[in-house]
């Protein structure tokens, strides 16, 4: 996958918190792609090839399964039977997501959260090269310099105000979304290149920055309070916003 997986999965000690049943351990031992004669080579984003590391895949799936009524081993098994020599890391991510999504049913609804977490992991890796998002100020500076965010964000707010707003953000709320919700965010709202599929942000930045734009002209003494209240309502879906607002506000098109 990537060198950052250990750092990423350690963000909240996810793996250590996950309990593994004896049956799941047995299933894992039966997966024998690590046998030298069965070695699969993966193609990384930089074009380099290296042997597949099943332990990294195992850790990511078990991390995403935390506190969910799902079988991580079933998702692993369903993923690995689709791996082939030369598969890219992006295809591995997508295969894992599909393996989880294919198990969603009325009898096993928690797979919608597992698939969503794996998709969020994938989107963040595409956007940032790692699981952990950058600070709000770093994100805005980079996106403004690339012409993807409205440059007035940097003139309307000071670096200290961005630091304060950064404290409002709870990126872990991404992990509470359903698969359908994340797919909608990916398809309609995230700033991205729709030609090559590059993604440049993750969901919590949308909710915070829409509020920051909407209240940017309010009195400085009170506007951050409005931004925080807006963010908390929008990011927990207590507030529904039209597509032009969600997709356009914070970008040079503005749409408000």
What are these regions (language model features)?
Residues 2-256:
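Extended catalytic cores of very large enzyme megasubunits
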